[in-house]
Amino acid sequence: MADVSTSMRLKLPVVCFILEIILIILFGALVQYDYETDAKEWHNQSHNDYENDFYFRYPSFQDVHVMIFIGFGFLMTFLQKYGFGSVGFNFLIAAFSLQWATLMQGFFHGMHGGKIHVGVESMINADFCTGSVLISFGAVLGKTSPIQLLTMAMFEVTLFAVNEFILLSLLGTRDAGGSMTIHTFGAYFGLMVTRILYRPHLDKSKHRNSSVYHSDLFAMIGTIYLWMFWPSFNSAITAHGDDQHRTALNTYYSLAACTLATYGMSAVTSHDGKLDMVHIQNAALAGGVAVGTAGEMMLTPFGSMIVGFLAGIISVLGFKFLSPILESKLKIQDTCGVHNLHGMPGVLGAIVGAVTAALATMDVYGKGMEDVFPAVADGSIDASKQGGVQALSLAITLGIALLGGLIVVFGTPPDTLCFEDGVYWEVPESEAPHEAQLTTVRTEETEKLSS
């Protein structure tokens, strides 16, 4: 089935082996356990084993890890003939990205004695970075080769770490749930990549750029996993105690309100007042994205529900009206609609975070101001300036993401072969008659395009 241009017999093994060998060498030279992981360092100090950060952070890490490998992977299985590619390539680029992210984040966020120290929190942060890459993957789903995806991941992880360093370390931005650093960055990076990869003849594969009953059901599995674990995602690296508790609670109510808004808007905007599974699979998650920045702040359950409600409405409207405009006018072919699930809700979350930060007072936060806004607590800046920093961070994130998406890519499958597993995967024998039929169609379409 695969022709010369899509064969991976040589290219993929070479790229995978070279990348992994380089990673192993770099890990050997630069990475070591942190003091809570190292046997000698841990036992040189006087403390109870249950004080180890592992017992506080690992439950959240488990949830985040499930979101990365099952949630994101299955959410993208809605394409009728691209289930292997959705879950399989998600697995591939996530495995690479979390290793590369460990190095890049460790390098930019400070090395100790010339070494990158790793522990459970660095694992969570690497998964966060990987999540941003998978968001971008959603924008180009079905239109890229594994080599392209690994190339994109390498560039994006590096730029993610740069953006994260500028925001969190230099500016003191608060973004625990990643509305800006993860969702906005990943969405607009992916949108720029898919714009650069614009395919004028992609309509030749439009009959495969759709779902069937069982593929939508599989995608809904991803949605449910993401929905259930999103409170852990947003609260995973916040300060222990009230901060983590508050973040999970705010996310919980934002998601619930978003879901009702999604169902309502889907019925209003869809044909004959019926629900559109695309809306339910995606827009119901927008509340988790939109509350990511302000989740650890004193947003209140009431405020969280408003944010989630607005996010659901915006997301559904984006799927219904904005996505067709982006494709027809701006030539942005966003396969999974990441602009509607991650892009616009991420921007909304950044704005909500900026406003909430600007309104922060000691009367509301008390001594808790030290955890949420340490620069405000120590008098370095006032709350209004913190709000300005949050707004500036959104602009910086958008700039780096859009410019970073201008990367050189190669090895793309032909327009007639997009959204199809058979290009890169061995499919079960039961699919053989269908594949044989598609081979004839491909030949005819290729001849038409060449003429």
Swiss-Prot record:
It is a multi-pass membrane protein. Glycans are attached at residue 44. Coiled coil: none annotated. SUPFAM superfamilies: Ammonium transporter. Residues 33-63, 109-121, 173-176, 238-247, 296-298, 362-390 are extracellular. One of its GO terms (biological process) is ammonium homeostasis. GO terms for molecular function: ammonium channel activity. Its main location: membrane. Gene3D superfamilies: Ammonium transporter AmtB like domains. It holds the Pfam family Ammonium_transp. The keyword Transmembrane applies. The keyword Glycoprotein applies. The chain crosses the membrane at residues 12-32, 64-84, 88-108, 122-142, 152-172, 177-197, 217-237, 248-270, 275-295, 299-319, 341-361, 391-411. Residues 1-11, 85-87, 143-151, 198-216, 271-274, 320-340, 412-451 are cytoplasmic. GO terms for cellular component: basolateral plasma membrane; cytoplasmic vesicle membrane. Keywords: Ammonia transport, Cell membrane, Cytoplasmic vesicle, Glycoprotein, Membrane, Transmembrane, Transmembrane helix, Transport. It is found in: Basolateral cell membrane; Cytoplasmic vesicle membrane. Belongs to the ammonium transporter (TC 2.A.49) family. Rh subfamily. Functions as an ammonia transporter. May play a role in the elimination of ammonia in the gill. This is Ammonium transporter Rh type B.
